Amino acid sequence: MDEWIAEFIKRIILKLPFSQTMTILKAWGFLTDSELQTLTLRYPKDITATEVVRLCEAKNATIDHAAALDFVFNHAFSNKKLWTVYQMSKTSESENDLFDASEFKLQFKKSIHAVSKNVTINFKEFGEALWIRIAWGTHNTRPNQYKATFAVYHSQTPHVFITGLGKACRPLLCQALVIASKYSQIQEMELKSRCLESLKDIVFKRFNQPFSSHHSRPHEKALTQKIVDPRVTYENMREKERVHHLTRETFGEGPLPKLELASYKLETMFRAESIMGGNLTAGNEPFRCVVKFSSPHLLEAIRSLAPAGIAEAPISTLLSCIPHKARNSFKITEKRGLHPASSQPTNF
């Protein structure tokens, strides 16, 4: 076994939480149960990592075996990476061909290796998802296994979830995906998160959809609250019910997908109607700013704003539309009115 492969395997083992080490090694499947029983899990973790490398050397592990371990690690801890959603499309209406995994892998490798031979490509299926691992190299350097790109493709959908993709490699990977999946074009969606499953919930519409209602106010029956102590006056009962009703109508009642960030880029012209007149920004350049919202669970935080009394109900569509528009990055510009001094926000 090459020394650099041994070092790569060792680094993966060192990244594993101590309690998860044996679980990951069993899922890897390269070492037998009897071989795993010889391992002694103890601190420092370097001792365990060295023992794993020794077993791998005895079995002459290859880069494909090391890549398989990297697959298992990144699948189990996918939330350690930032994932971006890409969407593919076809120029003309046509029936989707039956997915042939072998043909997909062949065409994918062929497309990339036609441009660069010094690239290692591996595939692994996890349920309905096909995971692709690409380690990029140059003419003078071997593929960098420590900065591999991962792409997760669901064959029955036009969506691909990608992480670790540099700008220089993006055109080549996108071209390979389009060719192998028999689509015409691909584009990046304005949707990112560390929670891969939540991104899937959003683009596949798997999360709890809010109900639609033609009533702007809740039913009277919903306003009746059991009064435990008749001496207590529930002054805000009706308003609280209205807020909760609008919140349920906007976000639903089930769990929401997990996103950590939403950003809004604003471009607008400041204008004055006083004697100074004209634009307040020099050179007719628009004023630009970026507003970012962050939270460990942003959508749940937004849903709780109105019930907590922090914001008025209903919540602005700029915030509530995130899961339905499948994006958490927006650019807001102004609509040009008939009069120079008039402007208003535009839809996004």
Swiss-Prot record:
The keyword DNA-binding does not apply. Keywords: Centromere, Chromosome, Nucleus. One of its GO terms (cellular component) is chromosome, centromeric region. One of its GO terms (biological process) is chromosome segregation. The keyword NAD does not apply. It is found in: Nucleus; Chromosome, Centromere. Belongs to the CENP-N/CHL4 family. Probable component of a centromeric complex involved in assembly of kinetochore proteins, mitotic progression and chromosome segregation. This is Centromere protein N. It comes from Xenopus tropicalis. The lineage of its organism: Eukaryota, Metazoa, Chordata, Craniata, Vertebrata. The gene is cenpn.
